[in-house]
Amino acid sequence: RGLGDVYKRQIPSTNCGVKNLSTDIPYVNSINVFSADNILIENNTLNNATKSGIMISDEYGSTVNGIIRGNTINNVGDDAIAVYGNHSNLLIDSNRISGAKGFAGIAISCLQNGQQIRVDNETTGPHDIIVTGNVVSGCSGEALYCIGSYKTYITYNTLRDSILEGVCLDSGCIGNYFAHNEVVNNGIAGGLPGVSIDNGIYNIVDSNNVYNNSCSGIKLVRTGLGNIIVNNICTDNAYNQMGAKSSGIDIEPLAVETENLGYIDGLGSNWNVVLNNTVTGSHDFGVFIADDDTANNGGSSCENVIMYNKFSSAYTFGAADFSSMSSTVKNNITLN
């Protein structure tokens, strides 16, 4: 019988864990979790997995209640920590990750058995997850990538030196909280922001330090609805913008690629609140609301509120709105 038959006969485990393991062996996944509850994965050193250092899979059911803490994961072929499926009540705390070559250093995803689903058909997904105190660096994708997660609380992490974005809240992320993080030197490929919300609603981005990323600090793209961007400091996010404009905060109704039309839409980024952020250093704009993209499966951005932000006096326009639809832009402050 194959290994799959063995898995199918397993009784789900509870109150179990892995501690103080050190391995450089190129396993597919160094640690696998299949439908186990009340788990502890702590103080392990996991190097050279061909896929993930720690994989929490939905293949045989969901995991509820778990702590992934104090692990060091280097040089893996995919995501260092992968949470795929309808898992909940997880704490991902104080891990050090470098050199992940997949989607992200930490990936939290609603993909069902690895397959993408439409955002308006999502009825389950990873939720009630805390991601705090982690240091993620040198990844080939994003440092942190969320797909269709909700009620995920991402705080006090350092996300740096990734080829793509520092963090992406993507494809139906709802009601997540991203606060007090340091997001630095991401988007090495060029033309990418430090923080991206792509098809996400009701997320809060609060009090982050976003600097030295490759194009913009914080970007809402395609459909971003009712998000709150508040109290962030965005500095010098234009070092490798590759001809694109750069702004501290960028609101874009970008077109949806043909291959993604079955999964996401390009309605536009509407009803977002951008409040009390500080934007200085190398950008073209403090806040930029882009023109419409209705001809290319995109949309228009409207009814956003841009207020009480502080912008460098070096910008020709602290806040610029090129959309055909109306937004509120007032009471912003130019710094000396």
Task: Tell what function each PLM region has.
Residues 1-7:
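Short, small-residue-biased leader/transition segments that mark boundaries at the very start
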Residues 11, 16, 29-34, 38-39, ...:
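Solenoid scaffold repeats with emphasis on beta-solenoid/beta-helix
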Residues 25, 30, 47-48, 53, ...:
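Residues in short coils/turns that link rungs of repeat/solenoid architectures in beta-rich domains
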Residues 53-68, 74-89, 96-128:
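Solenoidal tandem-repeat scaffolds enriched in leucines and small polar residues
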Residues 59-61, 110-125, 189-190, 240-244, ...:
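Intrinsically disordered, low-complexity Ser/Thr- and acidic-rich flexible linkers and loops
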Residues 296-336:
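Leucine-rich solenoid repeat scaffolds
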